[in-house]
Regions:
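N-terminal mature ectodomain segment of secretory-pathway/periplasmic proteins
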Residues: 28-100, 128-166, 170-174
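A short acidic/small-residue loop/turn micro-motif
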Residues: 111, 153, 177-181
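Pro/Ala/Gly-rich low-complexity, hydrophilic intrinsically disordered segments
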Residues: 188, 193-224
Length: 318
């Protein structure tokens, strides 16, 4: 009888272990399904609404209009308070209409998108660096949402919480949370209409009498600089920009793991201006600066200090 009992107990343990493994895989598949829905919804649905962006002590109110049809994507973002700003996406090109009303900054094949399109199209690599779990159900802008949490697997990124509309999957709220459990920044819709396409006329790109500033590249930064970002981060953008108050063009690099983003600016040292040395912060954005062979290197982003410091310290001139 004891042998029989041991045999049964052994199979019972294996059965429970198998059930737990299957249950874990099923939960992972369910989370991935939600994230895939959210990624597709932000790009493929028609919607319009107003959302609030909280970062540090600052608050901005923005209007988004998004249209998807046989011709592709149209998106318009308007800042509703303070200095007027407007961004217009026509498929992969983004036009930033500057406050002076005279200049438009054009970025072709822009990789980064605006909220609610915060998730990448390919999610497989993302889950190597985040542990994604389903939370409860909460309401945002009067709509029922599924909460999804993404906890970092290392110290190079913060945690994210997403509130996804249960009917469509569209992200209606997102929050970045640091290692102390405090909110770094948050987007949240106060009103949203999903399903009705905004008229094509609202996306008219008025360029009459305006000067278009193209981000240009005379020579790839990789030909001059060697940069090693944290694990999981890939370079997604590179440009040379003329920025206000800068005497020389600035090389701008963007690195992302698909969710977290950090930027790097490289410019010649201006002896008449004090450049940042060490770690600092601009509201919710961490900033790290150092000098390399007569150039100022600045890394910044809503990421842990370790990511900024290691990326900045990795920069070498070839």
């Amino acid at each position: 009888m004891r042998v029989g009992a041991g045999w049964w107990q052994g199979w019972w343990v294996l059965g429970v272990a198998g059930l737990m493994a299957w249950s874990g895989a099923a939960r992972a598949d369910a989370v991935l399904d939600w994230l895939n829905r959210a990624s597709a919804a932000a790009k493929q649905l028609n919607y319009s609404g107003v959302y609030v962006y909280h970062h540090g002590e600052h608050v901005e109110v923005l209007r988004v209009l998004h249209r998807a049809d046989a011709n592709g994507e149209l998106e318009k973002i308007e800042v509703l308070e303070g200095t007027p700003r407007q961004f217009l996406r026509i498929n992969s090109d983004v036009y930033c209409h500057l406050p002076d009303g005279k200049h438009v900054r054009l970025e072709r094949n822009a990789p980064r998108r605006f909220f609610p399109a915060i998730l990448p199209a390919q999610l497989g690599d993302l889950l190597e660096y985040y542990d994604a779990k389903l939370g409860g159900t909460e309401r945002v802008a009067g709509r029922s949402c599924q909460v999804v949490t993404l906890d970092p697997r290392d110290g190079y990124r913060y945690a994210f919480s997403l509130w996804l509309d249960k009917m469509t999957g569209l992200p209606l709220k997102s929050r970045i949370i640091n290692s102390n459990g405090a909110a770094v920044s948050m987007f949240v819709f106060s009103e949203i209409q999903i399903g009705k396409a905004p008229g094509v006329q609202v996306f008219r790109n008025d360029l009459a009498g305006k000067r278009i500033q193209n981000a240009s590249l005379d020579k790839p930064a990789s030909a001059i600089w060697e940069v090693t970002p944290p694990p999981g981060y890939q370079q997604v953008q590179e440009a040379v920009r003329s920025l206000p108050g800068k005497q020389a063009p600035v090389t701008h690099l963007v690195f992302s793991d698909g969710l977290s983003v950090l930027s790097m600016f490289v410019e010649p040292v201006n002896p008449q201006m004090q450049s940042l040395q060490g770690l600092s912060a601009e509201g919710a954005i961490g900033v790290y600066g150092r000098q390399v062979d007569g150039y100022s290197v600045t890394t910044l982003g809503e990421v842990p200090s370790m990511a900024l410091i290691e990326t900045g310290n990795s920069v070498k001139r070839k």
